[in-house]
Amino acid sequence: RVKLSKRKLDKYLKNPEFKRLYDSGVEIMTRMGKGNLSADTFNPVIVDFYREVGYLPSAILNYLMLLGWSLDDKTEDLTVEEMIRHFTLGRVTKAPASFDPKKLWSFQDRHMQKLDVKKKVAAMIPFLQAAKLLPQPVPCEVGPKLTRIIDAAGDRLKVMGDILNYSDFFFVKEEDFAYDEKDFAKRVAPPESKELLKKFREVLVGVTDFEVGPLEEALKKFIETEGIKIGDIVHTLRVAVTGKSVGPGVYDCLALLGKEVCLMRIDKALATA
């Protein structure tokens, strides 16, 4: 319950989204560079942008809080509970504060990395559903699979929407699976790449325990046998099974996709190249 509020020095922002955020502020909010932040200089669409790409509300609140208040000279990351517990008017700053999207991004990154994987799963499912990669209701097996994908992607996931870049190839229907044209032309289409992929397919056929450890060992032996560098095959393999050159580790991708899907996609890549 709000017991006390103070107006900031400049006029209220006209946009309703910003009005609710800034009505209780004290200092003048400025944009990067010169001049006050106002409805005329700050695009209101950006509010929806932060929501739709998957910024954490806690990260945004943490950043906005420190634009007009500070706990001390060194503490930046605060939970909502800590903000409530430590807040006093005596530490409200009087100088104008500048809204810096890059600074907000750093808060988002840190909050994201600290977030429990179960909460990430719950928050990312709606993004996958919006992209029509997951149905409603969500099948029971999706939770554990998505947990493994998130763990494999690690700190590559900066916002909730990033899950679309790192997991679409896990959930897409095989008839809709497609390759990034530039990645395919560079990594799979060259004759030498196609030949190595064809040979490694036969290695995968013989892998009985299709998990990260055995797959890594199989690839290492293949590299030694062929007298090649890991980069000569791993990028080709990644594009063949995921359709793109970025994503979680290639061994995680293979294990999560499963043997049947991997062989099917490699066959498609060989037929397409």
Short names for language-model regions:
Residues R1-F107, H111, I125-F127, H235, ...:
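Alpha-helical recognition segments enriched in aromatics with Gly/Pro capping
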Residues D72-T75, P96, V138, E211, ...:
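Short, surface-exposed helix-loop/turn micro-motifs enriched in polar/charged residues
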Residues M83-V92, A131, A153, F177, ...:
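Short, mixed-charge aromatic SLiMs
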Residues F107, L115-K118:
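Near-N-terminal "mature-domain entry" segment
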Residues V117-E226:
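Small-residue-rich helix-loop
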